[in-house]
């Protein structure tokens, strides 16, 4: 996600998130663009940007503005084996990222949200069709699905049920 145009569908989906998530995870954060967008959208939230690449995380830390540095942190983590407790995050975001469905379901809190965005829609190399996202997430206790489009991008938002 190189610039704000690439964030359009992601930000549209963020606007649809009900409530004020206190803990947000941006998985596959790369240089932190989506994590910083979440921090701006939810000014009370603590945001964790996780990525396997220390080089990307170094860039994310470098570009984090001072006004967000106190509540945004970047950590090295493998999306297939996240080091966070079950139900830790009220919002989990993935921008142009391979979905690790079991781990997403595990770390998303009951009634929490998971947001997938693809900056070039179906042209994104790792794009996952909304039908597949819905099917995989329904099997893992999610409901209340919504699709978003803005520019070339697409986003998909799902809410986890209270009890799975």
Feature roles, as predicted:
Residues 113-136:
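Conserved class I S-adenosyl-L-methionine
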Residues 17-18, 41, 108:
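A generic alpha-to-beta junction signature in SAM-dependent methyltransferases
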Residues 90-101:
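A short SAM/SAH-binding and catalytic strip from SAM-dependent methyltransferases
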Residues 149-164:
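Core SAM-dependent methyltransferase catalytic element
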Residues 101-113:
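A short glycine-rich, Lys/Arg-flanked "PGG" loop and its adjoining helix->strand segment in the class I
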Residues 23-27, 31-81:
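Class I SAM-dependent methyltransferase SAM/SAH-binding core
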Residues 80-92:
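A short acidic, Gly/Pro-enriched loop at the edge of an enzyme's catalytic core
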Residues 4-21:
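Conserved alpha-helix/loop element of class I SAM-dependent methyltransferases that forms part
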């Amino acid at each position: 996600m190189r610039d704000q145009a690439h964030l359009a569908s992601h930000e549209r989906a963020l606007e649809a998130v009900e409530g004020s998530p206190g803990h947000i995870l941006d998985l596959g954060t790369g240089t932190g663009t989506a994590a910083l967008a979440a921090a701006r959208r939810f000014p009370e939230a603590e945001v964790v940007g996780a990525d396997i690449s220390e080089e990307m995380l170094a860039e994310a830390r470098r570009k984090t503005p001072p006004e967000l540095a106190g509540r945004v942190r970047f950590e090295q983590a493998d999306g297939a084996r996240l080091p966070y407790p079950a139900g830790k995050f009220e919002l989990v975001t993935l921008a142009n990222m391979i979905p690790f469905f079991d781990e997403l379901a595990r770390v998303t809190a009951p009634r929490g949200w998971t947001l997938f965005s693809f900056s070039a829609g179906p042209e994104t190399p790792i794009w996952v069709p909304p039908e597949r996202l819905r099917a995989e997430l329904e099997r893992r206790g999610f409901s209340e699905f919504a699709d978003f489009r803005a520019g070339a991008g697409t986003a998909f938002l799902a809410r986890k049920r209270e009890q799975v």
